[in-house]
Amino acid sequence: MAIRDTLLPFSHSKTLWEVSSVATVFGIYSFLPIWKDHSPYADIADLPSGLHAALSVVVGWLLVFRTNTAYARWWEARTLWGALVNASRNAAVKLTRLVKLPNEERQQVKMLLSYFPFALRDHLRNEGNLDDMPEIKNESQIKHIPSIIIARLYERVSLWKSSGWIDGDELRVIDTELAKFLDICGACERIQRTPIVRSYRYFTRQCVMLLLLTFPWGISNDFGWWTVPLTMLTAYFMVGLETVAEHVEEPFGRDEDDLDLDGLCHTIENSVQQIISTEATT
């Protein structure tokens, strides 16, 4: 049952079908050197096996570096969103525990903290949406909604200070917590706006294609009809690594390999609402 539950989602994976299609094309292509070996041209233009082995090593190192670089971006993004979960919980606790707020102020804090992750998600996807934020919906030419939300929180904190609800020490504690939100936002923007160098991506793809085009010609003499499945298997893994790297290097989208930002947003929303609601009853 566990194996079936693991394989079923994979079998419906978009990446799987993309890679399998490419592997099938190279499998069909690998019939050419087999045909040549059984034709009058069998001794013409044989590819030295040593050349192919050297090319395999080079492409292997390129793919390792390519995959590691892409995954490092994905993992950094996941770490930042994990930090956002913690920052939201800490802010909810300190904003409601350090200050005895009226219910209206609590609702404002809850609304702003709950909406920040959704605003950041949409901002990283270039999908600004103000429908759930009536306070800022009417402001014109808003380009950075996460900053506006934090600015609204600072306006509330400034009001609390001028009203005597918090002192200077409490203000510094709250400022430290709120500053984390825009730090995380800026780090996410750095990942989003600094893609892997396009020339490097193209160069890696060209090397993979060159290797796969020469692979069956280098092994057909030794493996005969086994050249077809070996070529398909090699193409599957090499193209698969390149495809996975391409998908995970942009972690904020909607693909199946991207971060589950919707789930993380709802986790933060539920945590903030639970913390503030609990504080209100104590």
Residue ranges of model-derived segments:
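N-terminal juxtamembrane/topogenic regions of multi-pass membrane proteins
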Residues: 1-82, 101, 223-225, 269-282
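Membrane-interface, cytosolic juxtamembrane amphipathic helix immediately N-terminal to a transmembrane helix
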Residues: 3-17, 169, 176-207, 253, ...
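Juxtamembrane "helix exit" motif at the C-terminal ends of alpha-helical transmembrane segments
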Residues: 27-44, 208-238, 242
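Intracellular alpha-helical coupling/juxtamembrane segments of multi-pass membrane proteins
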Residues: 74-91, 177-185, 191, 255-261, ...
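Structured inter-helical modules in multipass membrane proteins
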Residues: 93-200
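Cytosolic/matrix-facing juxtamembrane and C-terminal tails of multi-pass cellular membrane proteins
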Residues: 235, 244-282
